[in-house]
Amino acid sequence: MCIRDSYKWVPIGYHGRASSIGVSGQVFKRPQGQTKAPDAAEPSFGPSKRLDYELELGFLIGRGNALGEPIAIGEAEEHLFGVTLLNDWSARDLQAWEYQPLGPFLSKNFASTLSPWIVTMEALAPFRAKFERPEGDPQPLPYLDAPSNRAAGALDITLEVLLQTAKMREAGEAPARLTLGNTTEAAYWTAAQLVTHHTVNGCNLQPGDMLGSGTLSGPKPDQAGSLIELTLGGKQAVTCLLYTSDAADDTPC
């Protein structure tokens, strides 16, 4: 395996953790870490300048499985308690430097926030949809496929990201919408498939464990689930409605 330049500067690691998961609305400090400018010879340490959100769903486990006992896809939803909104905050500049070859570490471990509400799978029964792959894409392998998953494995949930700047709060104005999409277009895998794949090699899940959906971005530009996608990596400004006086102006946020 080729060792990246960052290996000599930062202790590379990859992890999952529960210690820095909090409830939506919590205040946390801006993350710090190593970054390396394209024209710099060495990395530097400091606060992130590219803090980003990731629009996700969190799937909460209600009933676990024994070590060494995979959960079949036809039984996977019996192990799910419910669904919550998840914001998997990311420091993109830290991530760009540290993520090779294992993945993000300090760029994600500083905070993840959850909605204070969990919607049970039973309550979501009216909001189920067919699981269908886009034309031309491969069908799942047999262990990730079942009639029940094809018939109603997907969720039909509206996804929305709103931004409210300090100026907007001071003016008492409502947040501006950045993203409006739906899980039927944004989610490539179902919750049952995530549970089954996670346990297929015998990994045991426990009550209260959470599986993140990954960033939920639809095919249209205004369905992007993160700023890095919405701005095309910082190349395109995000415009929202800022109120600076009696008039409203479209101003880059």
Language-model features: where?
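Conserved small/polar residues in nucleotide/adenosyl-binding loops
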Residues: M1-D5, Y243-D250
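Active-site pocket scaffolds in enzymes
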Residues: Y188-V200, Q206-P207, L211-S245
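Acidic active-site catalytic centers that drive phospho-/nucleotidyl reactions
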Residues: E56, D88, D209, D246-D250
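Active-site microenvironments in enzyme catalytic cores
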Residues: R4-G181, Y188-A192
